[in-house]
């Protein structure tokens, strides 16, 4: 690993840089909570060579959203399902917007 690679990873939201303990500390939660959302398949941490869970910044943002919902009284399983559905809705909206742009572009090309 070169120094350039190491610095690039600092900006990589998907790089699994955080141990379970550090991730829990950053989120103000417990390692048990991180295990629970992992078991609910909301996030799947990568494993280090020694088998320890490692989390990315992207995964920590998802975990933070789950924690918000749980702190408001939503059961963990339901919070995970809500986040998954929110993500699916966002993806569907993105696809629909791209389709609309392509359709409008095709109509303008045909009219010209």
What are these regions (language model features)?
Residues 36:
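DNA-binding alpha-helical recognition surfaces that contact promoter or target DNA
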Residues 2-19, 25, 39, 44-45, ...:
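Arg/Lys-rich, alpha-helical DNA-contact motif
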Residues 30-33:
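Short coil turns linking two alpha-helices in DNA-binding domains
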């Amino acid at each position: 690993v070169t120094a350039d690679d190491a610095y690039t990873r600092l900006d990589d939201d998907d790089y699994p840089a955080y141990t379970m303990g550090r991730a829990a500390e950053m989120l103000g939660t417990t390692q048990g909570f991180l295990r629970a959302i992992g078991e609910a398949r909301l996030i799947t941490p990568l494993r280090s060579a020694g088998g320890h869970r490692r989390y990315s910044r992207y995964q920590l943002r998802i975990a933070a959203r789950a924690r918000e919902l749980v702190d408001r009284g939503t059961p963990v399983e339901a919070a995970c399902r809500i986040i998954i559905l929110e993500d699916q809705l966002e993806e569907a909206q993105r696809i629909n917007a791209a389709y609309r742009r392509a359709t409008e572009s095709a109509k303008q090309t045909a009219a010209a």
